[in-house]
Amino acid sequence: MVKEMMKLAVFFISLLLILLISETTGLNLEGQYLLEIKSKFVDAKQNLRNWNSNDSVPCGWTGVMCSNYSSDPEVLSLNLSSMVLSGKLSPSIGGLVHLKQLDLSYNGLSGKIPKEIGNCSSLEILKLNNNQFDGEIPVEIGKLVSLENLIIYNNRISGSLPVEIGNLLSLSQLVTYSNNISGQLPRSIGNLKRLTSFRAGQNMISGSLPSEIGGCESLVMLGLAQNQLSGELPKEIGMLKKLSQVILWENEFSGFIPREISNCTSLETLALYKNQLVGPIPKELGDLQSLEFLYLYRNGLNGTIPREIGNLSYAIEIDFSENALTGEIPLELGNIEGLELLYLFENQLTGTIPVELSTLKNLSKLDLSINALTGPIPLGFQYLRGLFMLQLFQNSLSGTIPPKLGWYSDLWVLDMSDNHLSGRIPSYLCLHSNMIILNLGTNNLSGNIPTGITTCKTLVQLRLARNNLVGRFPSNLCKQVNVTAIELGQNRFRGSIPREVGNCSALQRLQLADNGFTGELPREIGMLSQLGTLNISSNKLTGEVPSEIFNCKMLQRLDMCCNNFSGTLPSEVGSLYQLELLKLSNNNLSGTIPVALGNLSRLTELQMGGNLFNGSIPRELGSLTGLQIALNLSYNKLTGEIPPELSNLVMLEFLLLNNNNLSGEIPSSFANLSSLLGYNFSYNSLTGPIPLLRNISMSSFIGNEGLCGPPLNQCIQTQPFAPSQSTGKPGGMRSSKIIAITAAVIGGVSLMLIALIVYLMRRPVRTVASSAQDGQPSEMSLDIYFPPKEGFTFQDLVAATDNFDESFVVGRGACGTVYKAVLPAGYTLAVKKLASNHEGGNNNNVDNSFRAEILTLGNIRHRNIVKLHGFCNHQGSNLLLYEYMPKGSLGEILHDPSCNLDWSKRFKIALGAAQGLAYLHHDCKPRIFHRDIKSNNILLDDKFEAHVGDFGLAKVIDMPHSKSMSAIAGSYGYIAPEYAYTMKVTEKSDIYSYGVVLLELLTGKAPVQPIDQGGDVVNWVRSYIRRDALSSGVLDARLTLEDERIVSHMLTVLKIALLCTSVSPVARPSMRQVVLMLIESERSEGEQEHLDTEELTQTTTP
């Protein structure tokens, strides 16, 4: 009460001063109020410099409009929009009692909205949007009974919408989106009979959508997306006959979709996606004759697709994907003549694809992938002239691909992989030279690759592995400068690999394994400066290994095994500093093993068995401290002693030296190789005692007459070398569900080769060519948006960020700068402006490989994955448009000294991130791997829900002298020891990196620390457990650890983290198993039986 009286006194004193001043100057009272208002502003651009106290009236001042009364004009309008003003809004605004319009939008004003605004009783339009106002909406706003437009979006306003809003009976527009408004929606909103637009998205509004909303009888636009609204959708929404737009996506609505919504006969857009809606799709939706956009994806909808949906004669886009819909695709969908987009992927649909869909002449994007569809592909698809993207992968489709597919349509993306298709590849797929991604892998296709494909100038990815294709390597293919991936493995190709392969200058992946290629490997392959993976294994190639191949300095994976290569291995192999895997096994290579192999510090696997190598094992191999998966030198003709330097390979899991002519003793220091899971020294000429190795088996030492000690005959006076008895607990003692899952994972995983990464496109894409300044279409700009976002322009982004002003920067990274942009339509985006390295020349066109990557990323949708809304290229600026995450990154919050994340939030983040990764690994088809999991790439929304971000981004950032860089290896501290360039290794690398993030959440430590503080967090945790056992001392001291249940739960999650960071990728669980273990750990709340700590640390430590 005292504070209120003091504020009142200050107001009256200010009023008295103004009156006193007005007595000594000629300026009228409202002019004095305006000068007081100006005094609280910071006018950086001096836009208000003509506000002069010497004037008698303020009517000529910038932004001021008065009535026409000549004697004593009244201020009716104050419009200071976009004047670059900062500071605060003075309470003196309440003195402008005749004001009808107040527009302070697009400035930098802060502070609270003064309650004195309620004195402006004539106010009709109040626009305060795009500022930094905070605090609550003053309840006095309810006194503005003449108010028609209340526009306050894109501020920092908090609190709830006041009940007094219901007093604004003249209100037509209530626009409050992109603030921090919380609480429930007031039921008094039902009083607003004249309200036409209610937009309050991107806030934190909770509770239900009140049934009183049915009283807003004039409502046209209802936008409450991205809040925390829950409960069922009220059936009263059906009372809103004028409703045109219902935008309620990304909330927590549950229950059924009310059939009463079909009474909204003016409805044009219904966006209910990313909620928790269940039950069938109401057949009554078919009565919405004006409906154009229907988005119900990512809910829990079940049942069949109503045939009545076919009555939506004006529909343009329908997306029912990512639900649990069953039954057949209704043939009535073929009645929607204007349909451009139909997405039904990731459901449980059965039956055949209706031939009626081929009558949809305007169809441009069709995705029916990840279902259980059978039968043939309708022949009529080949006549759809507007077809841009066709994805039917992961079904059970059979028959042939329509032979004239591509003749009439301008195909950009075609993915029919993982089906049972047979016959030949159509010749016309790239007839119009726009094909970017062609994936027909894992089918039963036969015949040759058509010339029309091998000469396709726009082609970026050609994926035809695992078919029955024949013929020779298409030499024409390498005349196309954009090709980055050629996958022809597991077919029946014959003949030589042509010299023209050296012309594929952008090639990053060349996979030709398991064919019948013969002849020598062409030396021209050394011209492929961007090549990261070369797999020519299991062919019939002969001749020497050309030294030119070692000019491919970007090589990370080189697999030449199972051929007939001969001669020596050139020493230039030691110059491949990026190499992580080298497989040369089962050839006829001879000579000595090059000592230069010791330079390959990133090597994780070295396979050279089954050759004719002679001489000694180079001691330089002991420098390969990153070697982790295997060192295989078996079945050669090696002589001399085993160099003790190999004991430096502390991460090594498999050491195979059998079937050589090695002599001397097995170095006793091999007992320190605690990571060894398997080894074989058999059939050599070794002597002396066997070191204290783990998992000792007699078969690993037989064929060496001079060896002794367990498991062979005892050595004379070798008691010190006798191994200690195992104290491990029987497996039957561990009955925890988590451990059962873990055992199933470890026991069930086998080493296998997995196909290289294929790109997935499943989200709606709208491509709009921007206009040049003269109004003519420009070929130098490209905007790609992923609906249902509205089609904004590059100019909108410039305006929203004040031409990318520093004040809008919210982050910086190696890839570029991130800006916060609030667009006129109400969307808040994180705009990543990529660092450009094009120098000189006209290089504004977006290359096809870049577009393909962008489209791939934009097509991924999951609640725990940051959404890429689009890409914009304009006059040399490359912009990525992301979903905005207001809480920033996990790394920033977690490693801030003031971090107050409790365990419940941390576990929620851990589980959310795991679910996002599991979606990429297991539910996308083909599977997608992140490659750079770290705490800074896990972003948090207002509810601390985890969103995995930046996956795949490094592949689309232009690097100097290259069209697209090779896949990155991750970030320091998160990189799995065995990381290589294939899907198999990358998948396990993701899991390792995720395990590091778990350890960060548990310990609070950064992934890498100074050596004196324990070095990397993985080794620090392992060392701590070995020294002090599994106890709460390893956990973040900032957490409250008095609750034994919480500590027990955290230690259970710690075990999961240790499994994820196992040295052996074979021992790591899959992401799907990680999610199951985390869920089970929460259910049990730490009550599970525990793993034996000693065994756990032994099986996971290097």
From Swiss-Prot:
Glycosylation sites: 54, 68, 79, 119, 180, 263, 302, 311, 362, 444, 482, 503, 535, 564, 588, 599, 614, 632, 661, 672, 680, 695
Extracellular side: 27-737
Annotated PROSITE patterns: PROTEIN_KINASE_DOM, PROTEIN_KINASE_ST
Catalytic activity field: L-seryl-[protein] + ATP = O-phospho-L-seryl-[protein] + ADP + H(+); L-threonyl-[protein] + ATP = O-phospho-L-threonyl-[protein] + ADP + H(+)
CDD domains on file: TM_EGFR-like
EC numbers: 2.7.11.1
Signal sequence region: 1-26
Record keywords, A-Z: ATP-binding, Cell membrane, Glycoprotein, Kinase, Leucine-rich repeat, Membrane, Nucleotide-binding, Phosphoprotein, Receptor, Repeat, Serine/threonine-protein kinase, Signal, Transferase, Transmembrane, Transmembrane helix
Residue stretches spanning the membrane: 738-758
Residues annotated to bind ATP: V810, G811, R812, G813, A814, C815, G816, T817, V818, K832
Modified residues (Phosphotyrosine): Y882, Y919, Y974, Y981
EC top class named in words: transferase
Phosphoserine PTM positions: S966
Residues carrying Phosphothreonine: T793, T801, T982
SMART domains: LRR_TYP, S_TKc
Protein topology in the membrane: Single-pass type I membrane protein
LRR repeat residue numbers: 72-96, 97-120, 122-144, 145-170, 172-192, 193-216, 217-241, 243-264, 265-288, 289-312, 314-336, 337-360, 361-383, 385-408, 409-432, 433-456, 458-480, 481-504, 505-528, 529-552, 554-576, 577-602, 604-624, 625-649, 651-672, 674-700
Location within or outside the cell: Cell membrane
GO molecular function ontology, one term from the record: protein serine/threonine kinase activity
Residue ranges annotated as Cytoplasmic topological domain: 759-1102
Short name of one Pfam family: LRR_8
Record-annotated Protein kinase domain positions: 804-1091
Catalytic residues as annotated in Swiss-Prot or TrEMBL: D932
UniProt-recorded name of the protein: Probable leucine-rich repeat receptor-like protein kinase At5g63930
